[in-house]
Amino acid sequence: MIGCISPIFWGLSVSLVRTLSETLGVGKGLAINYLIALVFVFLLFGIPNLKAMPLKYYICGLGCAIGTSMTFAFSLGLAKDGTQTMEVGMINYLWPTLTILFAVLFNGQKAKWWVGIGMLLAIYGIFVVLSGNLLIDFKAMWSHIKSNPISYFLALWAAIFWAAYSNFTRAWAKGQNPTTLIFALDTIFFNAIWLLDLAPSYPWNTKGVLFAVGSALIMGSAYGMWTFGVQKGRIEIMSIMSYFTPVLSCIFASLLIGAKLTHEFWVGVSIVVLGSFICWAAT
């Protein structure tokens, strides 16, 4: 149950990261965000037993976690406006589908054959979002992607990295919660980007600081609860619950970053959610 709360917080993450990028800059905003979050998750979860986790988990599991942070942040930071931010965010929301796929292929999760139908529906929903057409206008979809290919490409890799992290954690973390370690590494990475001036940085402002604090608490809680859930709970149920994250994300985006979402966009999101019920029935 604890792990199932995290998708609610994930729904806020797209708008929060985008706002931080606009108010303080990707490097500066997320450096402060992860520094505060590091203190929070340390008090909440402490330090894991580093000797208990095998080397392969440090390389693969933590590597994927850091990869997620980098690709997710820059995919949103490079988006041109609120609407494109949500398009990029929807690509990132392929991670629930990929989490189930990886669990079936590599972690011994059992599923009925029609789980594939649910996964295809989720992918179809993403295509509808990107093309703006129920019949999938590949030309329009390609035009969207071509306008900012790096942003869309990074979003896809963020989805792949997070799905892999979830399954590596389930298989190899030995019951340890590495959230504090992950946030420590993220803090180092984003502070390096800020201090080395590798990304645009904006003057300090009240809105940016408030969002950094709020985002830190939300992201820290989401990471920790998700990691606890994939270790102790049923990863397939958590993945299904996470299918509702796109709906929450769209609602928050409309309120926080002024994203203008079309009817076709909402239909595409609804199709993604429909895929969740089919996957639920199959697992």
Q: Regions from the language model: what does each represent?
A:
Residues S15-T23, G77-D81, L130-S147, W194-A212, ...:
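Membrane-interface helix termini and inter-helical loops of multi-pass transporters
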Residues G11, S15, F42, L62-I66, ...:
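Hydrophobic/small/kink-forming positions within alpha-helical transmembrane segments
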Residues K28-L38, L76-N107, I235-L255:
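Specific alpha-helical transmembrane segments that line the substrate/conduction pathway
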Residues F9-L16, P48-M86, V128, A216-G233:
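Specific transmembrane alpha-helical segments of multi-pass solute transporters/efflux pumps
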Residues M1-K28, D137-A171, L217:
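Glycine-/small-residue-enriched transmembrane alpha-helix faces in small-molecule transporters
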Residues L20, G29, S75, L105-A111, ...:
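Hydrophobic/aromatic residues within transmembrane alpha-helices
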Residues V41, C60, A111-L134, Y243, ...:
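Hydrophobic transmembrane alpha-helices of multi-pass small-molecule transport proteins
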Residues M1-I2, G27-L44, L55-I59, G118-Y124, ...:
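Hydrophobic alpha-helical transmembrane segments of multi-pass integral membrane proteins
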